[in-house]
Amino acid sequence: MIRRVVWPRLHARWILPLVVVVGVYVLWRETRALHWREIAPGMEFATLRGEPYCRRGSAAIAVLRLDPERVKLRVQHYTQFGAARPLDVVEWQQRTRAIAVFNAGQFYPDYRYMGLLASGGHWLSRRAHPGYQGMLVADRQDGGGGAEVVDLSDPQHAADSLAWNEVAQSFMLFDSTATLRVRRSERIANRTVVAEDRNHRIVVLVSEGAYTLADYAWVLLNSNLGLTHAMSMDGGREASLVVARGGFRYASFGPWLEREPHPEVGTARTPLPAVITVELP
């Protein structure tokens, strides 16, 4: 005896919500996809969206992905140039002619850097900040080149953290276990973060709008960037990035509001005692 299998009928009222959910998921995946533009060999640029976690201004996040074996990261301090005052990010780019410039870590009201800072193998600040466990390092002293984001809480990496010519200390945002390394707070600000991805590339992420640190970490960890660990540089008005190469120009200075037009490069006025430049070898 052959039995007919009778499949249950799906009512339209059940199918329609399913179609909507699938459509929303596909659209969400599409909006998360990053469209990379090569700026120079070893340097790519894209824009990540941070909705709904941005609390003020544009939710866009500028993403600069760097191959540390093909580009050179340099720490710059205004005293190296004999400048009477710290430069803003646009002035830094004009002075150094670097392809990209972004802000370094925190500093005191008298512009002294908070933590270790070295440029070209010369110490600009020898006093380590005991609470800061993150360090951006570049140009290994044995001639190995490269760059890394070092988590000083890891003894294996901490012992190697000073064997570099370029050093900028700041605080960790999240570590290799995806653990948040800052206190949760409702304080919002524009953010500059430097991370490493699974391919050991350096990824710089500068927000155009204001996020809490915890929300920003969540957005980055759940992006398609494959980030393994990250440190936070200075935020608020100091969160700055300029990229200039050929016909490509990008500039962001925090904070600015979404209802306002994107600021022109000439409006950047926040002094930055120290910055990180990205150059070709």
Question: Which role fits each region the language model picked out?
Answer:
Residues M1-L10:
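N-terminal Lys/Arg-rich, disordered targeting/topogenic segments
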Residues H11-H129, L205:
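Zymogen propeptides
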Residues A59, D142-G146, D197-V203:
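Beta-strand-turn-beta hairpins that frame and shape the catalytic cleft
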Residues V63, M135, V193:
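Short, surface-exposed charged micro-motifs
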Residues Y78-F81, V150-A158, V206-A210:
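Short, solvent-exposed aromatic-acidic interface loops
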Residues Y108-S185:
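Active-site-adjacent helix-turn-beta-strand microarchitecture at beta-sheet edges
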Residues Y111-P130, L180-R191, E196-H229, E238-P281:
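Conserved, well-ordered active-site substructure
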